[in-house]
Regions:
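Bacterial Sec-dependent N-terminal signal peptides
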Residues: 2-5, 18-45
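Transition segment at domain starts
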Residues: 34-72
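Divalent metal-coordination and catalytic microenvironments
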Residues: 65, 92-95, 143-145
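Short, well-ordered beta-strand segments enriched in hydrophobic/aromatic residues
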Residues: 75-84
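Acidic glycine-/aspartate-rich tracts in secreted/extracellular proteins
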Residues: 84-86, 97-101, 148-150
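Extracellular C-terminal loop/segment signatures of secreted glycoproteins
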Residues: 102-112
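Short proline/glycine- and polar residue-rich coil/turn motifs
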Residues: 112-121
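Short, exposed beta-strand-loop hairpins at the edges of beta-sheets
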Residues: 133-158
């Protein structure tokens, strides 16, 4: 009887070891771990054009945005470059909204200053709330630049956040 008990104990031990090992390996998903890590870093990017403005506008202007988002402190640091706008941008900003949908402004409009032209660069630091960070990670934030000719937006581009 003692031999049978030892055999059952050994089988249960091996089964438990295999089960827990399998559970540990299947629970690890690096991509989701990075998205949910409270100190994860993300690379921000996005291309803007007049066709993405809702409703679309006529123009050959484009813009690109590049930067980082730090989920530890909520800071998104970006640099926006634009070219061929109808004139100098008078304002810009970040908005919550899916592609093709107008959304609400987050934070303040960018204070772009004076002396700008139809081609230029602007850098910004914005602190996101947890709701805005979730929208960023799911592709539901966009940026827009407005000009005197198109005060509701001349170019618009969705933001993409890629875990580093």
């Amino acid at each position: 009887m003692k031999t049978r008990t030892n055999l059952v104990s050994k089988v249960l031990f091996v089964f438990s070891f295999v089960f827990l090992g399998a559970l540990a390996f299947t629970a690890c998903d690096k991509k989701n771990e990075d998205k949910n890590n409270s100190n994860a870093m993300f690379t921000i990017s996005g291309n803007a054009s007049s066709s993405q403005v809702v409703p679309s506008v006529t123009g050959s202007g484009t813009a690109t945005i590049a930067g980082t988002y730090n989920s530890g402190n909520g800071q998104m640091i970006t640099t926006t470059n634009w070219t061929n706008l109808s004139g100098a941008p008078i304002t810009g900003g970040f908005y919550m909204g899916a592609a093709g949908v107008n959304g609400a402004l987050i934070g303040d409009l960018w204070s772009l200053g004076t002396g700008l032209t139809a081609t230029g660069t602007f850098s910004d630091t914005t602190t996101l709330t947890s709701e805005q960070a979730t929208a960023l990670k799911s592709g539901n934030l966009y940026y827009s630049l407005a000009t005197a000719a198109n005060p509701n937006g001349e170019v618009r581009g969705q933001l993409t956040a890629t875990p580093q």
